[in-house]
A protein has these predicted regions:
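N-terminal Rossmann NAD(P)H-binding glycine-rich loop of SDR-like oxidoreductase domains
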Residues: 3-23
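Rossmann-fold cofactor-recognition segment
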Residues: 31-46
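NAD(P)H-binding glycine-rich loop region in Rossmannoid oxidoreductase-like domains
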Residues: 44-81, 92
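Glycine-rich NAD(P)-binding loop of the Rossmann-fold in SDR/ketoreductase-type enzymes
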Residues: 45, 77-85, 107, 152-153, ...
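Conserved Rossmann-fold NAD(P)-dependent oxidoreductase catalytic core, especially the SDR/UDP-sugar
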Residues: 88-144
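Conserved beta-loop-beta element that borders a ligand/cofactor-binding pocket
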Residues: 105, 148, 158-183
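Alpha-helical substrate-binding/gating segment
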Residues: 166, 176-184, 196-218, 225
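Conserved C-terminal active-site "lid" loop/helix of NAD(P)H-dependent oxidoreductases
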Residues: 218-243
Length: 253
């Protein structure tokens, strides 16, 4: 299978490309030069420039984004990369006959559920009186509750995926990603024990997103098999036939 990865030069792109390259042909697009064969430098907001790279591609993994999600980030930074570029990538993929499209969304699309208990307590690391096996989970079919402008742009990317699936016949999986650290560590934020996605699990999860047959449209949550959960990752694992290997709890000091 020939797979095109946008944003291939980042941590997530590199981890996924390294894993998939053992069994697929990998190409990529990045805004900056990347020391990897098959990678082209291009601006995703220029659809005429990027369209030729999609010819003959079987699956697209769209990772490229403005990833800052601070409350004060402006639309001037978010709209070109997270909206215009994303629409261009969907459109170029469809025009080239790409079968499978995997869109990197974010847990932040549902992030305002973390303002409510019991999820607020779990995100803050306050576990007293809570049973991890009894906490209700935020599912993919619950209404989106974006926690900022960044999250709102990711929600739009999911809506584009639904359109291209329902109206254009493309197979689309939107991955509401947890936390992927450059160092593969959890860090000091207690929310990391909910959202941590190990590099090993990340790679195999995206492999399943690309390879699992019979999917028309799905929104899935991506994280490791962490003890404390807010989002319904187990249902996503079942949809993809994926078994995670890691658990953030094993790294708790």
């Amino acid at each position: 299978m020939k797979i095109l990865i946008t944003g291939i030069g980042g941590t997530i792109g590199s981890v996924i490309a390294d894993a998939l390259s053992t069994r697929h042909e990998i190409t990529g697009i990045d805004i900056r030069p990347v020391n990897r064969a098959g990678v082209s430098v291009a601006d995703l907001t220029d659809i005429d420039a990027i369209s030729p790279f999609f010819e003959g591609v079987d699956a697209v993994v769209h990772l490229a984004a403005e990833r800052r999600h601070t409350p004060d980030i402006g639309w001037d930074l978010l709209l070109p990369t997270n909206v215009i570029a994303t629409a261009n990538v969907y459109d170029a993929a469809h025009a080239a006959g790409v079968r499978r499209f995997v869109f990197a969304s974010s847990m932040h699309v549902a992030g305002n559920y973390e303002s409510d208990d019991p999820w607020a307590s779990i995100a803050a690391g306050r576990y007293d009186g809570l049973d991890p096996d009894s906490v209700p989970l935020v599912t993919a079919d619950m209404p989106a509750r974006p926690d900022g402008r960044y999250a709102a742009t990711k929600q739009l990317g999911e809506s584009l995926g639904r359109y291209y699936s329902d109206c254009e016949g493309m197979e689309v999986i939107c991955v509401r990603l947890g936390t992927v650290a450059d160092s593969d560590s959890i860090g000091d934020d207690p929310r990391g024990y909910v959202s941590w996605f190990s590099h090993r699990d990340l790679a195999e999860f995206f492999a399943a997103c690309v390879e699992k047959p019979g999917i028309r449209f799905e929104i899935v949550y991506g994280a490791s098999a962490n003890k404390w959960k807010i989002y319904d990752t187990p249902s996503s694992w079942k949809v993809l036939g994926f078994t995670p290997s890691d658990n953030a709890e094993h790294h708790r000091g």
